[in-house]
């Protein structure tokens, strides 16, 4: 997209509570590189928090809905410890390693103090990088960002007052800004990834995964959503730039 001359501007739609801190940094670099060739306008959906804000802060313009949940500038580390469970069911294991950090992150035992210190160092460095990215992207000082960071979550309306967001509105507002920046008429909007038709989507569905998910849903009931969140966290890296709660509005 960066080198496609037919693409004059990019509207990046962000609707995410965040995720892997490493992935957020990689996407931040990609957006920054794209920005050197053409305007990048971020349009925020329901969420653009933590990692969602991380990848947004470098854009030329950020547009959020008044009710968007954004900010949450912070990261955390979470390593499950299943030793109590394995002891309960009588499961034991042995480890052979070359040095004391070789099995760092092993969920079969609790962290020792050295590992806790190492994880804390990784979190501290990651947080400093996050704050630095926000300061650079928003043309603010690190001190100013730190006053509104530390994981605080803001609505789009408040975020605009704090300087984290430029404009209030939806994706149409973001498109208008993109068009104005490049001064074109008679444009066509192309969405990525391209939507699949029903048949293609059905053929791409793995029957085994679908059956398993339906069985789990029937067994877990209202807890299925929480199970999905935990499963998602377990599959991602140990350092997360993610809003640390799940909203359920009824």
Which residues does each PLM region occupy?
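Intrinsic disorder and flexible/low-complexity segments
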Residues: 122, 194-250
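Active-site proximal loops enriched in glycine and acidic residues that flank catalytic Cys/His/Asp
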Residues: 14-16, 44-46, 59, 66-68, ...
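Cleft-lining beta-strand/loop regions that shape enzyme active-site pockets
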Residues: 1-85
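C-terminal recognition in membrane/secretory proteostasis and scaffolding
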Residues: 2, 13, 88, 188-193, ...
């Amino acid at each position: 997209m960066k080198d496609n001359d037919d693409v004059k501007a990019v509207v990046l739609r962000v609707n995410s509570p965040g995720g892997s801190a490493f992935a957020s940094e990689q996407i931040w670099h990609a957006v920054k590189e794209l920005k050197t060739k053409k305007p990048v306008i971020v349009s925020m959906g329901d969420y653009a928090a933590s990692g969602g804000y991380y990848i947004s802060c470098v854009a030329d313009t950020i547009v959020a809905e008044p009710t968007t949940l954004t900010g949450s500038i912070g990261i955390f580390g979470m390593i499950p410890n299943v030793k109590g469970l394995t002891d309960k069911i009588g499961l034991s294991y042995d480890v052979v390693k070359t040095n004391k950090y070789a099995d760092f992150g092993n969920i079969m035992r609790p962290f020792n103090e050295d590992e806790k210190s190492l994880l804390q160092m990784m979190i501290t460095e990651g947080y400093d990088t996050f704050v630095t990215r926000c300061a650079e992207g928003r043309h603010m000082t690190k001190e100013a960002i730190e006053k509104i960071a530390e994981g605080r979550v803001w609505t789009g309306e408040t975020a605009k007052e704090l300087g984290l967001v430029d404009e209030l509105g939806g994706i149409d507002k973001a498109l208008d800004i993109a068009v104005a920046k490049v001064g074109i008429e008679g444009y066509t909007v192309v969405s990525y990834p391209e939507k699949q038709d029903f048949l293609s989507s059905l053929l791409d569905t793995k029957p085994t995964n679908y059956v398993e998910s339906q069985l789990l849903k029937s067994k877990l009931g209202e807890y299925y959503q929480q199970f999905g969140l935990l499963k998602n966290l377990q599959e991602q890296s140990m350092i997360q730039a993610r809003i640390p709660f799940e909203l359920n509005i009824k």
